[in-house]
């Protein structure tokens, strides 16, 4: 199913990076990986592009830890096109179609800093989202955040999909074999920041990692990894989650684990290689485009690509367990985590199961979208979004508290004052959707032609920008988000699970209630808004999405109501039925 991303991202996602800029005329900055010239961006901000932080992970370096690069006498050149790690073309990459795009020579970063800044400034290190299968550093423009909050912002690329997270006996060299190559890329980029960010006016002793969706997931991963010690000092997870696989699950020989898709055993077979006899040389000889397209052609549900408990990058006991273990804790690091009030509308908002489409003018133009059953839609969105808060906010923060962390903060993003159009009521269909908060943090509306609907030029939107940028800037400076328009933002604890509802025009509020998956499942059990198959699908998603899948919870739910319902097969049947009737399960 194509998601709402297709409508809103392709219509102008890359506009942020595409604005014309001129060289600043300043002397190049000489880093330990090359000399780089700055460009003058809007708002009297300097930006440095396409700085390598490791050797290209190609040939023998594929599926290995990033290797240090040391080239100080080379003048680096800004690339003509965005540097993108191999991935399938998609709305997130800004390229339409189904082909593989990108290059394995992709380990680069950008730096944005206020012009003429005095003294070492807080550093904000952005980790992009995209399910760890898509996305890149050029997607967002944090120049306004840098200027108004007086911070230095670093954005990075990291390996994605099967090139970023992969385990196979042919690649193992005995105990200590690693599998989380994308995570190691992020760690390598943080190492570059420690060595070089002072040259750009940044403070290497005050680095805040922040990321959204898979980026938030990776932020939490760095809190669990023993290899990231000392590389950052504060952390913000936006719509993150905690999930991982054991090496045995990730390999999944002969599909030992029936619910795990895209295991490396099956993946090797899909490449046309003998899974029993394949060698590291065989795997590294495969074309990167073939690797990406083979991966995306394989059936999948929710289980990959996954962080792998390799015992090196991520402790063998597991990602979730490591977050709660004082052995791996970084207790001096303040952490803020949050979720959005209507997370899942980004995926289901154009699904024909939930919406109708009419073409009042012509089918060559986007359809007019309306909800089939607004009450059922809102209920579905509410439960799934509460589930995201439970698994991506309350659970990890509670784990961190038990590991010894003292400064923890939580939020829920609620802003939904979009301007409705003739074609779609954005506030009703989308609302406070997944990723919609990012525009307020960067201080720049995205989404091109429909940006004026998504983020209208209103007092409400301006107020929200001020709230978000101020809170994130405060956190980077002090480790606390500070008050919101005079309202104190109390820290989070298991006994007092405070979170700030982030909304504009006086609608913000401090609350203290934790989301719990079992309670949410009980709410679903009591509901009369869903039919039998919808109840099972929602129970399955709440039990298996975002956190480590709890298949037993699903089997036992509501006295075993859905124990004999194969939701994966059911969803496939529904999708195929929609495709047969409409040609696609999406309204686009």
Predicted features and spans:
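Substrate-gating cap/lid region and adjacent catalytic-acid/histidine neighborhood
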Residues: 247, 282-462, 471, 478, ...
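Short glycine-enriched nucleophile-adjacent loop
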Residues: 216-228
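Bacterial N-terminal signal peptides
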Residues: 5-14
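A conserved short beta-strand
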Residues: 229-242
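Alpha/beta-hydrolase active-site loop
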Residues: 106, 176-198, 256-265
